Amino acid sequence: MALDYAKEQIRVMAICPGAFNTPLLRNSMAGDIEEGFKAMGDAHPIGRIGQPDEIGNAASFLCSDKASFITGEYLVIDGGMMALSLIHI
């Protein structure tokens, strides 16, 4: 898609989020939510789950002129989980 629209100066990117503190995640958890978030965070290399504003900050950057040469990219925002999985390949 990025190649299809590049000549029109339309940039195409995707944000691929990991575990984030959202109502969807909260509603899917049983038991103590904060305890669950801590356990999930401990599994992440960065030591916590993400906050919604971190996705917003990335989206704002990608939509800005500062990212004007970026197209056809996937931005993984997952606290290092993908990097962790690559260690085991």
What are these regions (language model features)?
Residues 11-17, 21, 63, 76-78:
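Conserved SDR Rossmann-fold cofactor-binding beta-strand/turn motif
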Residues 60, 71-87:
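Short C-terminal tail/terminal secondary-structure segment
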Residues 3-7, 20, 50, 63:
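A short hydrophobic alpha-helix cap/turn motif
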Residues 7, 19-43, 84-87:
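A glycine/serine/threonine-rich, flexible loop-to-helix segment
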Residues 6, 11, 70-72:
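Short, small/polar-rich loop/turn modules that mediate ligand/substrate recognition or access, typified
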Residues 44-55, 66:
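A conserved structural motif in NAD(P)-dependent oxidoreductases
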